[in-house]
Amino acid sequence: MKSLVLGLLVGSAIASGPLQHVLHAPPEPEPEPEPEPQVVKDPFEELRDTFDRLRNKAGDIWDDVMDNIPNIISNIRPPTIPPKKFTRLPDSEWTHIVRGADLEALWVDDESGYKHRKVDGKLAQYDLRIRAVDPSNLGIDNVKQYSGYLDDNLNDKHLFYWFFESRNDPDGDPVMLWLNGGPGCSSLTGMFFELGPSSITEDIKVKYNPYSWNSNSSIIFLDQPVNVGFSYSSQPVSDTVAAAKDIYALLTLFFTQFPQYSTQDFHIAGESYAGHYIPVIASEIMHHKDRNINLQSVMIGNGLTDPYTQYPLYRPMACGEGGYPNVLDSETCRSMDKALPRCLSMIKSCYDVESTFTCLPASIYCNNALIGPYQSTGRNPYDVRIDCKGNGLCYPQLNYITDYLNQPYVMKSLGVEVDSYESCNMDINRNFLLHGDWMKPYHRLVPYLLAQMPVLIYAGDADFICNWLGNKAWTEALEYPGHTKYAQSPMENLTMVNSEGINEIFGEVKSHSNLTFMRIFKAGHMTPFDTPQASLEFANSWLSGEWSEV
């Protein structure tokens, strides 16, 4: 799943609460203030005090804020995140260990006799630890499974992954990497909540998922960046780019240990803030000429990729122009329209400079002005049709997943080295925000990818936070050689035979010049959760190359 938007009203968010995610519940009512003891000033207190005034008069006072913000931002020091407690398992506990140094030392001759390294990249600092998971221990699926850690020994980073073979034809079916967003949310929530082999029930039992995406593909679920889910590190992570080299190393070492998968088609898929991650990761892979990763396409669901083009569509989606009744009243909608020009000017400054100084203010102002009004209603930001349920992320099922994964026998079966699991790490979310990553223009990498592979952007049409209007708009605005033909292409029906044997229209699609956009009807932010059969239908069609042009 994954994305959150915690704490969009800046005053309280920066100082004490989770900042923005692309997935987040409405803020809890603030308790009555109590007398505070004299303590050392919080490093964010000055920033909080300045931005507190934005709550009701963001537009009127922003010029004053901008007069003061340079010194404030320059003095920001993100909070020190205490490292997770962990117990490193001995090497004897692992089925395989792949040493990056051994792979980096391998040289081969090409047809002309030129000697070069077998695979590109700096790999010596990495090891991949692999454990064969006994399917009968957990009952998640009866297919072959592996779990383990990618270790960056130089930087003390340890990324957890869990691999499931295809239920159909593991020797011939494609392989997929799945990433959730946040930033800071575990991909195991996507696995159990959306598209993995099983879900977790209210009584913390495993329930088989007949619509799992591993029905016709093998899948790696990866907890990244570090300190997300079962991953851990003593080092903080604060931007999208940092993880790309780690993921390249993980895939390279994994396919070295399991060469049978390396020749099969490989795809990267994810949702929400993975709209930032995936263009960077895919570009990193494709920049390595000698690689054992057969990357064929990328898939981004309800993603945040081009804020400048996507943010103008928050008001239409909240105000009844996205195919569902309005959530906000007309006065609030007009106030969002008035705030938009300033928001776009600030995002443009972020795009022009790509610095914390320009990108952080854009995140704060735009999220308060264009997302904050919706957040205050109590409506589910991931599904405009329903109210937010329970605490945290609006879906009680996520608590079931956390309870299941924190059971000692589960952690032991997987070789987990940390002492607990949490679905989303708000410290990471805050760090990404404070370093300006939220508003950066990662869509600029997509044309490079389109020249080499198909790209799918899909969106459940009931989502607010990364809505279909914005995702359709940015694909149509994207500057690449196929822009005109793609933008002019009509939307066509997506159909399937449903479980009752009836031919059903479940969405719309447009595709040209390697770029495809899908609108999935009756689905929210987590499309496979709301429409499991339809999601498996379009995923299988995509993986089979139905819209490929390269």
Curated annotation (Swiss-Prot):
Disulfide bonds join 185-424, 319-333, 343-366, 350-359, 388-394. The keyword Signal applies. Glycans are attached at residues 216, 493, 514. It holds the Pfam family Peptidase_S10. It catalyses: Release of a C-terminal amino acid with broad specificity. Belongs to the peptidase S10 family. PANTHER family: SERINE CARBOXYPEPTIDASE CTSA-4.1, SERINE PROTEASE FAMILY S10 SERINE CARBOXYPEPTIDASE. Vacuolar carboxypeptidase involved in degradation of small peptides. Digests preferentially peptides containing an aliphatic or hydrophobic residue in P1' position, as well as methionine, leucine or phenylalanine in P1 position of ester substrate. This is Carboxypeptidase Y homolog A. It comes from Paracoccidioides lutzii (strain ATCC MYA-826 / Pb01) (Paracoccidioides brasiliensis). The gene is CPYA.
